């Protein structure tokens, strides 16, 4: 998700709020990691294995067919002479030892896996390049640089990419294109690897996306408390809801309970960004630091789930009734019962726990853990394995 923390004046400052994809700045105590720790609670224990891997780690994926963990590193694009190259890592799912590392042609940030097709889709958040990685040959087999998006004056707009959703039934990818003004949704045709449609109208900071393929709907959220519904058949926005939430960074569909789960981040400087960069006269609705359960048909808040400070990513393990939330600033993972909203346990993972992946067979969770921004591009960041 990540540094983008130089000043409010830099165009990429919007990505400060997108810490699930990009690096951040708040610093707490950290150390090297290669050992197993036991996290105790009244409901049992969690075993945590943590291993340093590489600088600039972002998203992670687990492949059931290969039984490996993939983690992507952006390298150090600001200092090519540093020798820190963008890479994709294959990790042992038990020990997290590096089994292979493959250099990428562009920095990798966002990552999603189509395991049946043996494909990883990797996006360069800043440069807008989508890479197709064949997991059988361990090679990037194709790439697409997103076309420029023009603003109202016909000038190229600064766009950043974070999440990728695979629509296998329609052979498409969906990528929110985040901007300060009119965010877009890019629809990529996988047969031709071209942009099939650019859908405008998602306003300031569209980041969250989730698909309900059974209902034929996409849900997209932004950083000004709005939830959009897109019809997958027509690729039209059919609804827009004003949610009693503020920074809807990440979305997950809870199919069993027919609701959406949304991070309400609580990034303390976003109001300044909305005003100075977005030109918005926006009234803050909440203080954030929570997960919202939403009615997808209306955007109504059904439940407020308090978590740690500045949550960024969500992972729902529905068969085991566990919702995992990475809390960036408090440096921990909240494990929540999604039915009741009650916290099951808290797992400390300083400095900044980031993005999740799940082994659906065992329930083992993998999470990238980032360092403070001054170390993120040079020192090794880690991947943690959580099991019960």
Task: Set out the residue ranges of the language-model regions.
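Gram-negative bacterial Sec-dependent N-terminal signal peptides
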Residues: 1-27
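Predominantly soluble domains enriched in secretory-pathway, periplasmic, or organellar proteins
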Residues: 25-388
């Amino acid at each position: 998700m990540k540094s983008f923390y130089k000043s409010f004046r830099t165009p990429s400052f919007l990505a400060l709020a997108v810490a699930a994809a990009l690096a951040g700045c708040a610093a707490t105590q950290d150390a090297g990691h290669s050992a197993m720790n036991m996290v105790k609670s009244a409901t049992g224990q969690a075993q945590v294995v943590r291993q340093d891997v590489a600088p600039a780690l972002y998203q992670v994926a687990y492949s059931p067919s290969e039984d490996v963990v993939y983690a992507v590193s952006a390298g150090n694009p600001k200092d090519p002479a540093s020798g820190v190259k963008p890479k994709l890592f294959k990790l042992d799912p038990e020990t997290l030892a590096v089994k292979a590392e493959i250099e990428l042609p562009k920095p990798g940030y966002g990552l999603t896996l189509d395991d049946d097709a043996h494909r990883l889709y990797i996006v360069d958040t800043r440069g807008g390049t989508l890479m197709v990685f064949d997991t059988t040959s361990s090679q990037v087999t194709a790439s697409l640089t997103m076309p420029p998006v023009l603003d109202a004056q016909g000038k190229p707009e600064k766009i950043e990419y974070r999440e990728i959703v695979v629509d296998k039934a329609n052979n498409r990818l969906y990528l929110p294109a985040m901007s300060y003004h009119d965010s877009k949704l890019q629809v990529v045709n996988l047969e031709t690897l071209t942009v099939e449609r650019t859908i405008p109208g998602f306003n300031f900071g569209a980041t969250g996306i989730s698909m309900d393929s059974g209902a034929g709907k996409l849900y997209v959220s932004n950083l000004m408390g709005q939830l959009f519904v897109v019809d997958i058949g027509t690729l039209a926005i059919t609804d827009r809801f004003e949610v009693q939430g503020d920074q809807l960074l990440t979305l997950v569909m809870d199919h069993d309970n027919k609701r959406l789960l949304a991070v309400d981040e609580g990034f303390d400087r976003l109001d300044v960004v909305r005003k100075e960069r977005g030109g918005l006269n926006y009234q803050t609705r909440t203080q954030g630091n929570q997960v919202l359960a939403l009615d997808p048909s209306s955007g109504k808040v059904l439940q407020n789930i308090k978590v740690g400070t500045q949550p960024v990513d969500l992972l729902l393990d529905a068969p085991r009734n566990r919702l995992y939330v990475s809390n960036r600033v408090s440096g921990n993972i909240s494990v929540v019962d999604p039915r009741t909203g009650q916290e099951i346990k808290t797992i400390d993972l300083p400095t900044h726990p980031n993005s999740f992946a799940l082994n659906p067979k065992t329930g083992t969770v993998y999470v990238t853990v980032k360092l403070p921004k001054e170390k993120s591009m040079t020192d090794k960041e880690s991947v943690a394995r959580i099991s019960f």
